[in-house]
């Protein structure tokens, strides 16, 4: 679904859809996320077929002028291609009028002769759009095939004049009949056309037939607006005439007259339609209502109102892929089904037989989790084993007491040991093998209870704080915007407005405990009030609360040590460096002095969408095509930046190079090789190398044992890798420091 809305036409609380459960798309008739139904109504008279004058580009190459009809159809095609992905539930139709009915093979049907319905108003369909795409592809090939000779007159692609032959000027259609045809097309769409219904009217004739009797046109347009359709006009200047909407169109469309000045006509003719293309091609995700929960106030939550929340920021992805099955020309989606089977029997398990388990302890010791568990044995068997264990422990305790009293129990201990071993052997043979209990199993209800801590989805206000209590670094997660919901609790809007006004009056925000959805855990949050702001264009910011989830202690980590040290005493730039950077920034700012993220689509998604379009329309996709490389709108304009600020960039770089603080210390080159694994060896884990040296058995040691001993006692091996060479180095070291090492060895032996 698309999310078209006029600038400043922000929705109010009532405009938000209240139906559905969590994470449902708002399908209301208001601005947030309604469907878009567009009917292109294009004038195909003789003047629309005339190409505009030729121009030259920056390199001096000849650029052939295109006709207004050619440009309008090209924009209509691009908008439809964009809506295949950005608004698959939207509808687009294409109506051309002032087409010669005698030269068109298709029957106009129930519509007035002279109207050519090239595409009926219906949901976006790639198969139907291929007709327009192939038409424009042929027109592009014929347009580019024209000679580059400037003396040769530019002509319109033959395919356009053949497909939409213009009617004679004396037989051009009355605008009332054209508006009536638009009305029929929208009514034929039925009740499915819910949402924004618009007609894009494109013409260059400011004095069409029907000027002397305008009442039929006014009546037809009134019927169109009654059905909820709005008209957006794109008037085209002819090369020798500037379009004047005050003559006819403003009167018919019930618009106020504008201050018309007879300036030079627009050389391109369709600048406004090009701007429209920039706005409509922007791919935006629909706004979603993420939760509907009660908001509780008072000591024990005595006051309860209903609120809904929508996400202010969400990450747009490529969408989930689906498994499909190709059956000729039909593509069917495969229905996925997941089943769990028992590892012991292979039987399919029911949902009630599957739970969740958590592990603890050393799982590496668990060899086979399918063996019987002692906790699951019979009660009598467990009691018998426990009695035997208690008997052994009691005997051991008694024997220790007698030993403390000085009795000689060596023979008795030997007999007891043999008896215990014999008894244990019988027990092991009788009992199945068991494993350590490292898994705890819970039902889904128990896991849900653990996660929710018994708190139902709600927002419970705990108190109020001053704005000074907020810290910027606590804003880690995406915020939500909440507004009242009258669906569950009547009077929620009044109570919500009173709470909002009180917070704004005293400059306070609410501290709350929230659990926004049934699969969420309880979290602390703050409700920051937002005051309604309006302008001449309407509502700029709606009233409500921004819900910001606060982090737990485990979610906060200190910055790296080097970063913390840098922030404590950062190097300060000199005045010369600051002035040089000011000059660079001044010449590389955005023209609008503001960053508009909506005009910079994600390059990865842009490539993904374009490839999907190519697949849908059976087109080749060449990544080396300049048009495909231009999809990345985030690529910096290096040429323009260097031309405007290149001199100042060089000056800034010189200032940095002359600063002694910016000198970097280069590390000495190191040989490439397999890095030795750094290990810490305990002294008690080392082999007794001195004793083995005295006995002449060093050759029995492993190379790694010799290296560990040499590393621990800081004996340089001088790059020796062979065992014989290492033994020679160790022997030489021991022979020179035999006394010291002997003392160390004796100390180790005593311990």
Curated annotation (Swiss-Prot):
Pfam family, one: Ku_N
Acidic residues compositional bias, start-end: 404-415
Gene Ontology molecular functions: ATP binding; ATP hydrolysis activity; damaged DNA binding; DNA helicase activity; telomeric DNA binding
Region called Disordered, residue ranges: 381-423
UniProt enzyme class: hydrolase
GO biological process terms held by the UniProt record: DNA recombination; double-strand break repair via nonhomologous end joining; telomere maintenance
Assigned GO CC terms: chromosome, telomeric region; Ku70:Ku80 complex
Record localization: Nucleus; Chromosome, Telomere
Domain of life: Eukaryota
Ku domain ranges (all copies): 295-587
Primary location group: nucleus
Gene3D superfamilies named in the record: 1.10.1600.10, 2.40.290.10, SAP domain, von Willebrand factor, type A domain
Keywords annotated in UniProt: ATP-binding, Chromosome, DNA damage, DNA recombination, DNA repair, DNA-binding, Helicase, Hydrolase, Nucleotide-binding, Nucleus, Telomere
CDD domains: KU70 (cd00788)
Catalytic activity: ATP + H2O = ADP + phosphate + H(+)
EC number(s) per entry: 3.6.4.12
Compositionally biased spans, kind Basic and acidic residues: 391-403
Assembly: Heterodimer of Ku70 and Ku80.
PANTHER family membership: KU AUTOANTIGEN DNA HELICASE, X-RAY REPAIR CROSS-COMPLEMENTING PROTEIN 6
Function in brief: Single-stranded DNA-dependent ATP-dependent helicase. Involved in non-homologous end joining (NHEJ) DNA double strand break repair. DNA-binding is sequence-independent but has a high affinity to nicks in double-stranded DNA and to the ends of duplex DNA. Binds to naturally occurring chromosomal ends, and therefore provides chromosomal end protection. Required also for telomere recombination to repair telomeric ends in the absence of telomerase. KU70, of the KU70/KU80 heterodimer, binds to the stem loop of TLC1, the RNA component of telomerase. Involved in telomere maintenance.
Family recorded in the similarity comment: Belongs to the ku70 family.
Protein name: ATP-dependent DNA helicase II subunit 1
Species for this entry: Cryptococcus neoformans var. neoformans serotype D (strain JEC21 / ATCC MYA-565) (Filobasidiella neoformans)
Gene: KU70
């Amino acid at each position: 679904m698309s999310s078209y809305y006029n600038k400043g036409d922000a929705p109010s609380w009532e405009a938000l859809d209240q139906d559905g459960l969590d994470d449902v798309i708002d399908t209301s008739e208001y601005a947030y996320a309604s469907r878009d139904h567009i009917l292109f109504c294009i004038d195909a008279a003789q003047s629309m077929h005339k190409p505009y004058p030729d121009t030259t580009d920056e390199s001096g190459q000849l650029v052939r002028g295109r006709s207004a009809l050619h440009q309008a159809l090209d924009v209509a095609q691009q908008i439809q291609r964009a809506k295949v992905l950005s608004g698959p539930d939207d509808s687009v139709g294409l109506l051309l009028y002032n087409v010669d009915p005698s030269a068109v093979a298709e029957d106009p049907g129930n519509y007035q002769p002279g109207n050519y319905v090239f595409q009926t108003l219906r949901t976006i369909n790639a198969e139907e759009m291929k007709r327009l795409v192939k038409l424009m592809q042929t027109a592009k090939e014929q347009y580019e095939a024209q000679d580059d000779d400037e003396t040769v007159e530019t002509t319109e692609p033959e395919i356009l004049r053949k497909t939409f032959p213009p009617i004679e000027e004396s037989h051009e259609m009355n605008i009332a009949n054209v508006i009536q045809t638009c009305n029929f097309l929208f009514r034929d769409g039925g009740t499915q056309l819910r949402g924004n219904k618009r007609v894009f009217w494109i013409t260059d004739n400011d004095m069409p037939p029907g000027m002397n009797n305008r009442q039929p046109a006014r009546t037809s347009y009134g019927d169109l607006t009654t059905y909820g359709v709005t008209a957006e006009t794109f008037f085209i200047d002819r090369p020798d005439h500037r379009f004047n909407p005050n003559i006819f169109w403003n009167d018919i469309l019930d618009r106020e007259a504008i201050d018309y000045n007879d300036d030079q006509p627009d050389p391109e003719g369709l600048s406004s339609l090009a701007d429209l293309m920039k706005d409509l091609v922007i791919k935006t995700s629909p706004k979603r209502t993420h939760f509907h929960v009660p908001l509780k106030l008072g000591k024990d939550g005595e006051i309860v109102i209903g609120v809904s929340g929508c996400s202010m920021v969400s990450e747009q992805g490529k969408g989930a892929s689906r498994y499909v099955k190709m059956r000729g020309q039909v593509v069917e989606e495969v229905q996925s089904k997941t089943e769990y089977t028992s590892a012991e029997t292979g039987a399919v398990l029911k949902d009630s037989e599957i739970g969740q388990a958590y592990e603890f302890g050393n799982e590496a010791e668990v060899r086979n989790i399918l063996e019987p568990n002692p906790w699951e044995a019979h009660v009598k068997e467990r009691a018998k084993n426990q009695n035997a264990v208690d008997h052994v422990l009691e005997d051991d305790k008694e024997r220790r007491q007698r030993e403390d009293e000085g009795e000689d129990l060596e023979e008795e201990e030997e007999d007891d040991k043999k008896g215990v071993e014999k008894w244990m052997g019988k027990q092991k043979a009788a009992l199945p093998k068991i494993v350590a209990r490292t898994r705890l199993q819970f039902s889904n209800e128990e896991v849900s209870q653990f996660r929710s801590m018994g708190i139902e989805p709600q927002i419970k206000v705990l108190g109020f704080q001053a704005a000074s209590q907020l810290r910027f670094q606590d804003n880690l997660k995406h915020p939500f915007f909440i507004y009242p919901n009258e669906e569950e609790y009547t009077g929620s809007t009044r109570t919500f407005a009173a709470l909002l006004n009180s917070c704004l009056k005293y400059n306070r925000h609410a501290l709350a405990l929230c659990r926004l959805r049934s699969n969420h855990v309880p979290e602390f949050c703050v409700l920051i009030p937002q005051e309604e702001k309006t302008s001449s264009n309407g509502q700029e910011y709606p009233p409500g609360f921004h819900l910001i989830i606060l982090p737990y202690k485990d979610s906060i980590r200190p910055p790296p040590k080097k970063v913390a040290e840098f922030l404590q005493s950062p190097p300060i730039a000199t005045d010369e460096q600051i002035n040089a950077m000011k000059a660079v920034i001044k010449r590389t700012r955005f023209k609008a002095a503001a960053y508009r993220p909506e005009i910079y689509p994600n390059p990865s998604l842009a490539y993904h969408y374009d490839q999907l379009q190519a697949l849908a329309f059976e087109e080749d996709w060449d990544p080396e095509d300049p048009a495909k490389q231009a999809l990345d709108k985030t690529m910096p304009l290096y040429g323009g930046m260097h031309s405007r600020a290149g001199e100042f960039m060089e000056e800034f770089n010189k200032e940095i190079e002359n600063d002694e603080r910016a000198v970097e210390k280069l590390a000495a080159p190191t040989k490439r090789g397999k890095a030795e694994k750094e290990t810490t060896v305990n002294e008690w884990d080392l082999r007794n190398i001195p004793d083995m040296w005295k006995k002449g058995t060093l050759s029995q040691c492993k190379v790694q044992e010799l290296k560990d001993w040499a590393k621990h006692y800081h004996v340089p091996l001088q790059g020796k890798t062979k065992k014989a060479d290492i033994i020679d180095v160790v022997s030489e070291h021991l022979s020179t420091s035999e006394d010291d090492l002997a003392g160390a060895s004796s100390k180790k032996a005593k311990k």
